Regions:
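HEAT/HEAT-like alpha-solenoid repeats
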Residues: 414, 446-447, 510-519, 545-551
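Short beta-alpha connecting loops at secondary-structure transitions
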Residues: 193, 331, 374-382, 515-518, ...
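Structural detector for internal amphipathic alpha-helices that build alpha-solenoid repeat scaffolds
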Residues: 405-408, 430-442, 461-475, 480-486, ...
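Alpha-helical repeat scaffolds
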Residues: 548-549, 580-586
Length: 598
């Protein structure tokens, strides 16, 4: 069922002879809300808006459910981007004190920032990244007034040049305890209170990073018109895309806002005057909650701010390959005719729902592309949208069956109490508990409880997070990894292979022999793919592991993903036999040198 109030009854209009009817200025909050069309009895609830937030672009919750909103208050305040580089933006903090789901207590947590772009709540600190620098800072409110009063630089990355739309975003604490960002070929990791850098084979993405329950990330690129990519495997093993990973026609969009303000110009405008292809895709997120209809779980939600729409993509994983398809062929999950609806962030919330940021403004393209005489400048001037600024909305996606979960109080709980949340059906709770345990000073006290959970809990996701929590604490044992390699769950087994990498690198024979003799490795294609990746990543040339690789390639070499990984990691996998020959030749050459024969 669609829900739409006839737009022409509510919009401020200006008729132009011989031309279409244009919306001018802003709709009221009520009318803008009513104009949003949603599928399948879903609806939006407005939980936070201006005047409490202005120009919101990202958000995240701390362990007690306080919401931190990143506000780029100087972004495109006119068509020439005047004043954009002034340090007057902020990160605000919001609480729901009544339990009704609406945020009613508001403070400015950090003020006078230069276009903040990343926020990651840690324990009682939040980590922040801003524009034009790769430095990262943590902020803390030490006196409980909702305003940060302590600031510590945790990473010195130096200046970062380039257009503000093409600088890193993210700061996503991943399942594997890496903290991922876009663009840069690196990730971060907390080890004993120090933020360390991990090199990656490639960077990617633009605004936001999604993550599924298996720890695979979903990147997007507005400039590249790519709604999702690099989601076939963790990017540490290489940036892998497969042919056909998007269903036919997936990039075609179906807006009802017929506004041609697209940077790609007329080629990206349909016959009605609206967007015809993904272009502004940003802030995508996998729904990992437990309070909305079950068929939404695992779907990728992709905001498209240029099209004033949100795509719901079904994520299908078969034979080691992920494919995305539009759940609603020929239409969209969420869309509106309100020209100021600019969705650009979607994420699972602590209450089990999903929250969406609507930046709610006229211009959604940085000034480099809106210069005088440009195509976009002509559209901006004709529609008079440069004056539509300093608003912002956050919506909760809800459903008649929705019943909100309790508010979290994890920052107040003991480390022992946090362990149970690792098996929570909502991914936000699991991720947050894992992060908090790793950051706690008394984390070693819960090692026995984590090991028990990893071995015997009925929830495969609980076992999975217990294993990765131990890994983040440097308390994972080879015995537990060997045990997990035989888990009844393919998801747990596959991650156990990932977790085995340091033990493979160290030549731990118990783990090596267990991996090679695991019955599931014969037919579990997910485990096969991960084993090929992990042996390669370990750098081991143990003959037993080489035999495992050879056997897997012989048995599964025709699998599309296995073939792609073989090509991607040719120096590790496809050329392994040649490398062994070269190694033997090198050794022989060295001995010959010693004996004066060459």
């Amino acid at each position: 069922m669609k829900r739409l109030l006839p737009f022409l009854l509510i919009a401020p209009l200006l008729a132009e002879p011989g031309d279409k009817v244009y919306q001018k200025g802003f709709l009221s909050k009520e009318d803008s809300h009513k104009s949003i069309e949603l599928q399948d009895d879903y609806s939006f609830e407005l939980v936070l808006s201006d005047p409490h937030i202005h120009e919101p672009v990202a958000m995240a919750w701390d362990g007690n459910g306080a919401l931190y909103v990143v506000e780029m208050r100087t972004y495109m305040q006119d068509a020439d981007a005047n004043g954009e580089q002034e340090a007057t933006s902020r990160i605000s903090r919001h609480e729901d004190t009544t339990g009704d789901g609406v945020y009613d207590k508001h403070t400015v947590f950090i003020d006078n920032l230069l276009l903040p772009r990343m926020v990651l709540p840690l324990d009682d600190r939040i980590m922040v990244g801003i524009t034009n620098t790769l430095d990262l800072w943590t902020y803390r409110d030490s006196d409980g007034d909702g305003v940060a009063d302590e600031k510590v630089k945790v990473y010195e990355g130096g200046n970062r040049g380039g257009n503000m739309e093409h600088q890193p975003s993210g700061l996503v604490w991943n399942l594997d305890n890496s903290i991922n960002i876009t663009y840069e070929n690196k990730a971060y990791r907390f080890t004993d209170e120090k933020l360390e850098v991990q090199k990656l084979p490639r960077g990617g993405g633009q605004w936001g990073i999604g993550m599924d329950d298996a720890g695979r990330n979903y990147y997007s690129a507005a400039g590249g018109e790519r709604p999702a990519f690099y989601f076939q495997q963790p990017i540490k093993y290489g940036a892998l895309d497969l042919r056909g990973q998007e269903a036919d026609g997936f990039r075609v969009v179906f807006p009802i806002a017929d506004v041609p303000d697209v940077q790609g110009g007329p080629r990206r405008v349909n016959a009605r005057g609206g967007l015809n292809n993904f272009t502004g895709c940003a802030g995508q997120g996998i729904y990992r909650g437990d309070r909305l209809p079950a068929d939404l779980k695992g779907n990728l939600i992709i905001p498209e701010p240029v099209g004033r729409l949100i795509r719901r993509a079904k994520v299908t994983r078969e034979n080691g390959k992920t494919v995305l398809s539009n759940v609603y062929p020929g239409t969209e999950f969420i869309r509106t005719r309100d020209i100021n609806f600019r969705p650009l962030w979607a994420t699972t919330s602590p209450d089990g729902a999903m929250m969406v940021i609507d930046m709610h403004r006229g211009i959604i393209q940085q000034g480099n592309w809106t210069r005088p005489k440009s195509y976009l400048r002509g559209v901006i001037d004709k529609w008079d949208i440069d004056k539509n600024i300093q608003k912002g909305r956050i919506y909760r996606l809800t459903h008649p069956t929705f019943k909100a979960d309790k508010q979290p109080r994890m920052l107040d709980e003991s480390t022992a109490e946090l362990v149970a949340h690792l098996a929570h059906p909502n991914g936000w709770w699991r991720d947050t508990a894992q992060k908090l345990i790793i950051l706690r000073k008394d984390r070693d006290t819960v090692v026995p409880a984590l090991e028990k959970l990893a071995r015997s809990h009925s929830s495969e996701l609980g076992r999975l997070h217990a294993l990765w929590t131990l890994e983040g604490m440097s308390k994972l044992t080879p015995g537990l990894v060997s045990f997990a390699l035989a888990d009844q769950s393919s998801l747990v087994r596959t991650n156990a292979v990932r977790l085995s990498e340091p033990f493979l690198a160290d030549g731990n024979q118990d783990v090596i022999e267990t991996l090679g003799s695991t019955p599931a490795l014969v037919e579990d294609i997910e485990m096969v793919i991960q084993t090929i990746n992990s042996i390669g990543a370990s750098g081991s040339d143990d003959p037993k592991l080489i035999a495992v690789i050879d056997a897997l390639l012989e048995r599964h070499g025709e699998n599309e993903t296995v073939g792609a990984i073989k090509n991607l990691q040719g120096s590790v996998v496809a050329s392994r036999a040649e490398a062994r020959v070269q190694k033997r030749l090198g050794a022989a050459f060295g001995k010959a040198m010693e004996h004066g024969k060459v």
